[in-house]
Amino acid sequence: PVSVKTRLGYETPEEFAALLDIYNRYPIACLTIHPRVRKEKYRGPVHLDAFAAALEASRNPVCYNGDLRTVGEVCALEARFPSVTHVMIGRGLVADPALARKLRGGAGTNRKELSDFLAALYQGYTDFYQGQVPTAAQRMREVWFYLIHLFDDAEKLNKQLRRFRTPAEYERIQAEILAACPLRSDAQGDLI
């Protein structure tokens, strides 16, 4: 089976009709649609009306991908598009590593779980980059771009995260966030 991930087009959502004509010629196991065009990258609102039209016209099963960060957002999507049985979540899982568990009715995250997750991820990056700790720390900066929203009162430390120069600085800032910044109550539940 072949799956395809696509956007609505390069310049405008109207380009998708021609793309869908091509996709509909083949037995695709799952057509994952990110309802933005390429030039929008990840900015601006998703084009849900264009997604609705694509969903109706597709001959293949459709998976939704784009801006799903909370249980509430996934539930709203399911309510609006009940025929969508699959979703793809990317940055939403980086922003809330417990999101998949919460979608299955489980608990949100806690400070220890986040600390363990971040330590394992940092070590994984260090191993992957063959001991290049500065490179691993830079990768962690990218993770924190999304993850910082789980914490209250973290604005000052978030600025430091964006500007650190050494792995030791990164490690100090992360430790301070985990020790001093309150975990948002909705991080422990849902980010609605």
Predicted feature residues:
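Active-site glycine- and acidic-residue-rich loops that bind
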Residues: 1-18, 68-70
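Alpha/beta catalytic cores of nucleotide-metabolism and tRNA/nucleoside-modifying enzymes
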Residues: 16-30, 42, 49, 53-64, ...
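Short, flexible active-site loops
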Residues: 36-37, 104
